[in-house]
């Protein structure tokens, strides 16, 4: 159970870190609050299978946010360096 706990804490910290650059008005604060609320909703979960499923869902969210950042950076670079013919 302590291994799952450390994985949950690690995922929480990673998602909070990713939330620093979340786009939009009050994006970082809103994203971090939503992550905090989601983790607090499941804080009393004891079933290891359910915890593993929630961890998988959290990892998926992290990958989606990372993809969003990559797309945002790509669009920014393309906009700066595109030639209008």
From Swiss-Prot:
Cellular location(s): Mitochondrion
Sections of the chain in a coiled coil: none
Mitochondrion recorded as keyword: yes
GO cellular component, one term: mitochondrion
Effect of disrupting the coding gene: Lethality during first instar larval development due to reduced lipid reserves and energy output, characterized by decreased ATP production and increased reactive oxygen species (ROS) levels. Metabolic defects trigger defective food-seeking behavior and lethality.
Family affiliation: Belongs to the complex I LYR family.
Note: Was named osi after the Argentinian street language for the football term 'offside'.
Protein name listed in UniProt: Electron transfer flavoprotein regulatory factor 1 homolog
Lineage, highest ranks first: Eukaryota, Metazoa, Ecdysozoa, Arthropoda, Hexapoda
Keyword Mitochondrion found: yes
A GO biological-process term: negative regulation of oxidative phosphorylation
Native source species: Drosophila melanogaster
Role according to the record: Acts as a regulator of the electron transfer flavoprotein by promoting the removal of flavin from the ETF holoenzyme. May act with the ETF complex to coordinate lipid homeostasis in the fat body in response to stage-specific demands.
Assigned keywords, A-Z: Mitochondrion
Database matches in InterPro entries: Complex1_LYR_dom (IPR008011), Complex1_LYR_ETFRF1_LYRM5 (IPR045296), ETFRF1 (IPR052000)
Pfam families hit by this protein: Complex1_LYR
A single MF term (Gene Ontology): enzyme inhibitor activity
Superkingdom, taxonomy of origin: Eukaryota
Tissue: Highly expressed in the larval fat body.
């Amino acid at each position: 159970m302590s291994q799952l706990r450390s994985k949950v804490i690690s995922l929480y910290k990673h998602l909070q870190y990713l939330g620093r650059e979340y786009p939009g008005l009050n994006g970082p604060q809103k994203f971090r609050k939503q992550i905090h609320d989601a983790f607090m909703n499941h804080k009393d979960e004891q079933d290891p299978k359910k915890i593993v499923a929630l961890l998988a869902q959290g990892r998926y969210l992290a990958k989606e946010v990372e993809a969003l950042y990559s797309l945002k950076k790509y669009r920014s670079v393309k906009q700066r360096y595109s030639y209008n013919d």
